[in-house]
């Protein structure tokens, strides 16, 4: 992936592009028969643009570090737009695919509050889907918007180590095939815990745990561990 922060009309802005590669195995029961399928390849490309509307002036390098060191109480309001592009591997005659064969637009608004070593954040997001006119076996897939609300809290130690926890809910996303609605409206809940450790002044190590569950008939129940390096320049 690629992330770049820059100044735009005297505001702090950021562009992010990610191109995932996936390998997975799905297990299920079809007409009473246990079934397993595997997929491997490129998934859809993700692009995101974000800008701060209030707070956090556009600074770089030492000026930004000095500002962060001197600012102990601050409120930041930001907005973003993410787009999922239909670039991933997609087979019309298969029900499970790595690509979605449709665009997904995600407008987002968030509020971040820093109070000394504590940080609090709340974010609202809408997921808006275009139609997939080449759905499984030549059908048309439509889907209602899916709405999420997330909140998190973070504490940063003097050493630069930080820990955080968060939770969120998601509602909506009912779909229809050829105009016939399906009983698959989602009611999801998830939580996460993560920690970061500085390696150098511009490189850090991050580990996180995610868990999701669903309250409706359809949804995803998962447990995920993520480990990565985060760099800045």
Residue ranges and their predicted role:
Residues 1-4, 47-53, 81, 107-113, ...:
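Residues on the lipid-exposed face of transmembrane beta-strands in outer-membrane beta-barrel proteins
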Residues 132-233:
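Outer membrane beta-barrel transmembrane domains
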Residues 10-13, 56-59, 117-120, 160-163, ...:
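Repeated loop/turn-to-beta-strand initiation elements of outer-membrane beta-barrel proteins
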Residues 10, 38-42, 206, 222:
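Generic structural signal for well-ordered secondary structure
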Residues 1, 42-46, 102-106, 146-148, ...:
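Transmembrane beta-barrel architecture of outer-membrane proteins
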Residues 14, 20-142:
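Outer-membrane pore/translocation modules
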Residues 1-8, 12-14:
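N-terminal low-complexity, intrinsically disordered segments
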């Amino acid at each position: 992936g690629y992330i770049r922060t820059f100044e735009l009309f005297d505001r702090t802005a950021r562009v992010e592009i990610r191109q995932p590669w996936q390998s997975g195995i799905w297990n299920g029961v079809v007409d009473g028969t246990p079934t397993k399928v595997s997929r491997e390849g490129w998934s859809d490309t993700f692009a995101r643009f974000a800008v701060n509307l209030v707070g956090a002036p556009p600074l770089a390098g030492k000026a930004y570090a000095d500002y962060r060191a001197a600012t102990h109480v601050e409120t930041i309001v930001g907005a973003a737009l993410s787009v999922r592009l239909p670039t991933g591997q997609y087979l019309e005659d298969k029900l499970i695919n790595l690509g979605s064969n449709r665009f997904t637009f995600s407008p987002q608004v968030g509020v971040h509050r820093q109070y000394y070593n504590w940080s609090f954040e709340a974010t609202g997001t809408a997921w808006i889907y275009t139609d997939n006119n080449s759905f499984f076996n030549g059908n048309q897939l439509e889907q209602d918007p899916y709405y999420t609300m997330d909140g998190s809290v973070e504490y940063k130690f003097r050493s630069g180590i930080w820990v955080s926890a968060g939770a969120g809910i998601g509602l909506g996303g009912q779909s229809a095939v050829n105009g016939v609605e399906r009983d698959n409206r989602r009611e999801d809940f998830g939580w996460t815990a993560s920690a970061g450790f500085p390696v150098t002044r511009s490189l850090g190590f991050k580990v996180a745990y995610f868990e999701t569950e669903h309250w409706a008939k359809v949804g995803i129940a998962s447990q995920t561990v993520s480990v990565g390096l985060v760099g800045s320049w």
